[in-house]
């Protein structure tokens, strides 16, 4: 299974829900706080996203709490 990258920010409810869903479904991931990592923030913005969470798995990416997308990688 390809490892995901989860871009988050503090106090983000959808970020917590996405993290919980990835963990529950056994999808391995690295979490990156975009408020502390400016390169990560620039990357997320370059993908066209302006809100967290952003999930990147291989060439696929999305924003927001999307359990339907997580299921595709289980």
What are the functions of these language-model segments?
Residues 24, 28-29, 41, 74:
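Catalytic phosphate/metal-binding cores of nucleic-acid and nucleotide-processing enzymes, i.e., regions
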């Amino acid at each position: 299974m390809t490892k995901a990258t989860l871009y988050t920010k503090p106090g983000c409810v959808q970020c917590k829900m996405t993290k919980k869903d990835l963990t529950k479904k056994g999808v391995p991931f690295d979490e990156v706080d975009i408020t502390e990592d400016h390169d990560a923030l620039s990357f997320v913005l370059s993908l066209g996203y302006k809100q967290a969470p952003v999930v990147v798995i291989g060439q696929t990416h999305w924003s927001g709490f999307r359990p339907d997308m997580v299921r595709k990688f289980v």
